[in-house]
């Protein structure tokens, strides 16, 4: 099974023990590590951070210790406007320029492939995304004729039914991609007026709106649309989503007044790294959604949906049962990468739990 792990370059800026550089990554933990994110400037792939080139090198040095490790560079992301992708992909010339710029950039910096993180293509972008994927793959095939190992091509795809229907020709893009990472962890956020889990494995009985909003539905839907199981990778989060409660109610459907308070290290409302959640759990009340098979915790007026070792192991068992290609983890730097927060003296407790299940016969 593949275990595809994202690393985010901005995690270097978190203070103190939250700061994560690629040398913190265990080279044997994942089969693939994806560096997020690269930029596009003048229609060519480019660095984003001032020190990206140094960090690329630090990451790719991990392959000295584990020569089997593959690394990919992800282009795009949430802060990269989807309309910028549209502009490049919709015109033959700019698309050509972008595609041509990719192999030399990846080779120069020691990457094994490219991950497309166009979040998210709109209705008009559907055929342009297909063309981009098809032409990028053709370029990778052409480039490998020189005798080098062919570059890998993957894509991160929304797990929401509406977004899938709108932006992706799944059957077509699947033919040209080496794997597809399904972002099965953004099903519920602080934009909702009530509490709910962002990464349930199955639908909840209580919640009519959750019929489509769970990993099981998304996986089944993708397979039905023509994604081959052996190319489909299921996303598992190492972060939680937090809410500020608007009343004393804490169960399903409890009203919220907004996102939860920012974490000490990640400093973003409504989101917490697993290592911050381990801190939060001291003195908190924990619960589990039996049907959705994911935990949540409350303390004061804060309500946090998250994943723990039990829930990620369940998800790993599920994807093995569905005979998928493997699991994807977002992100290594949000797991307890130092092993100092979650009390087991174990680095990357969630990612390791997934790895353990994938390794079981």
UniProtKB/Swiss-Prot annotation:
Q: InterPro entries annotated for this entry?
A: Chitinase_II/V-like_cat (IPR011583), Chitinase_insertion_sf (IPR029070), Glyco_hydro18_cat (IPR001223), Glycoside_hydrolase_SF (IPR017853), Glycosyl_Hydrlase_18 (IPR050314)
> Which amino acids does the record list as binding chitin?
49-50, 76-79, 120, 183-186, 241, 330
One GO term describing the cellular component: endoplasmic reticulum
| Annotated region described as Important for AKT1 activation and IL8 production, given as residue ranges | 302-316
Q: Which gene encodes it?
A: CHI3L1
Q: Which Pfam families did the record assign?
A: Glyco_hydro_18
| Record PANTHER family | CHITINASE, CHITINASE-3-LIKE PROTEIN 1
- As annotated in Swiss-Prot or TrEMBL, what is the tissue specificity of this protein? Detected in mammary gland.
Q: What function does the entry list?
A: Carbohydrate-binding lectin with a preference for chitin. Has no chitinase activity. May play a role in tissue remodeling and in the capacity of cells to respond to and cope with changes in their environment. Plays a role in T-helper cell type 2 (Th2) inflammatory response and IL-13-induced inflammation, regulating allergen sensitization, inflammatory cell apoptosis, dendritic cell accumulation and M2 macrophage differentiation. Facilitates invasion of pathogenic enteric bacteria into colonic mucosa and lymphoid organs.
For this UniProt record, give its keywords in alphabetical order, as a comma-separated list. Answer: Antimicrobial, Apoptosis, Cytoplasm, Disulfide bond, Endoplasmic reticulum, Glycoprotein, Inflammatory response, Lectin, Secreted
Q: Which GO biological process annotations does it have?
A: activation of NF-kappaB-inducing kinase activity; apoptotic process; carbohydrate metabolic process; cellular response to tumor necrosis factor; chitin catabolic process; inflammatory response; lung development; positive regulation of angiogenesis
Query: Which Cys residues form disulphide pairs?
Result: 5-30, 278-342
Q: How does it assemble?
A: Monomer.
What sequence ranges are listed for the domain GH18?
1-361
Designated name of the protein: Chitinase-3-like protein 1
Location in the cell:
Secreted, Extracellular space; Cytoplasm; Cytoplasm, Perinuclear region; Endoplasmic reticulum
For this chain, the family text in UniProt reads: Belongs to the glycosyl hydrolase 18 family.
Where would I find glycosylation on this chain?
Answer: 39, 345
GO-annotated molecular function: carbohydrate binding; chitin binding
């Amino acid at each position: 099974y593949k275990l595809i792990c994202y690393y985010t370059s901005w995690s270097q800026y978190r203070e103190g023990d939250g700061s994560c550089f690629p040398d913190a990554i265990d080279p044997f933990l994942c089969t693939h590590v994806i560096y997020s994110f690269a930029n596009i400037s003048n229609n060519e792939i480019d660095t984003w951070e001032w020190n990206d080139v140094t960090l690329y090198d630090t990451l790719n040095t991990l392959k000295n210790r584990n020569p089997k490790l593959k690394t990919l560079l992800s282009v795009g992301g949430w802060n990269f406007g989807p309309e910028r992708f549209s502009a490049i992909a919709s015109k033959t010339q700019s698309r050509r320029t972008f595609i041509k710029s990719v192999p030399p950039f990846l080779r120069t910096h020691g990457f094994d492939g490219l991950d497309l993180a166009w979040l998210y293509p709109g209705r008009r972008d559907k055929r342009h995304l297909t063309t981009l994927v098809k032409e990028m793959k053709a370029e990778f095939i052409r480039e490998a004729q020189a005798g080098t190992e062919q570059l890998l091509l993957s894509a991160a795809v929304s797990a929401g039914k509406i977004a899938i229907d709108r932006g992706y020709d799944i059957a077509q893009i699947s033919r040209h991609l080496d794997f597809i990472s399904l972002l099965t962890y953004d099903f519920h956020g602080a934009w909702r007026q009530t509490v709910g889990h962002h990464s349930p494995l199955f639908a909840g009985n209580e919640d009519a709106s959750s019929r489509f909003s769970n990993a099981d539905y998304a996986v089944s839907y993708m397979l039905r649309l023509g994604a081959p199981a052996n190319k489909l990778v299921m996303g598992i989060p190492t972060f939680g989503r937090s809410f500020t409660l608007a009343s004393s109610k804490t169960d399903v459907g409890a009203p919220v007044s907004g996102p939860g308070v920012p974490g000490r290290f990640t400093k973003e409302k409504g989101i917490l790294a697993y290592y911050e959640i381990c801190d939060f759990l001291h003195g908190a009340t924990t619960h589990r959604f039996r049907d959705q098979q994911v935990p949540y915790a409350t303390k004061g007026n804060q309500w946090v949906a998250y994943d723990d070792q039990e829930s990620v192991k369940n998800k790993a068992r599920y994807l093995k049962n569905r005979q998928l290609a493997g699991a994807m983890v977002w992100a290594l730097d949000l797991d307890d990468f130092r092993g100092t927060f979650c009390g087991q003296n174990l680095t990357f407790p969630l990612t390791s739990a997934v790895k353990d299940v994938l390794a079981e016969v």
